């Protein structure tokens, strides 16, 4: 994993 729903990575 890396990125959330849209285009911002957590």
UniProtKB/Swiss-Prot annotation:
Transmembrane segments: none
UniProt-recorded name of the protein: Conotoxin Bn5a
Keywords: Disulfide bond, Secreted
Family: Belongs to the conotoxin T superfamily.
UniProt keyword Disulfide bond, yes or no: yes
UniProt KW Metal-binding keyword: no
Domain of life (superkingdom): Eukaryota
Domain remarks: The cysteine framework is V (CC-CC).
Coiled coil segments of this chain: none
Localization (cell): Secreted
Cystine crosslinks: 3-10, 4-9
Gene Ontology cellular-component terms listed: extracellular region
Tissue expression remark: Expressed by the venom duct.
């Amino acid at each position: 994993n890396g990125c959330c729903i849209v285009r911002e990575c957590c």
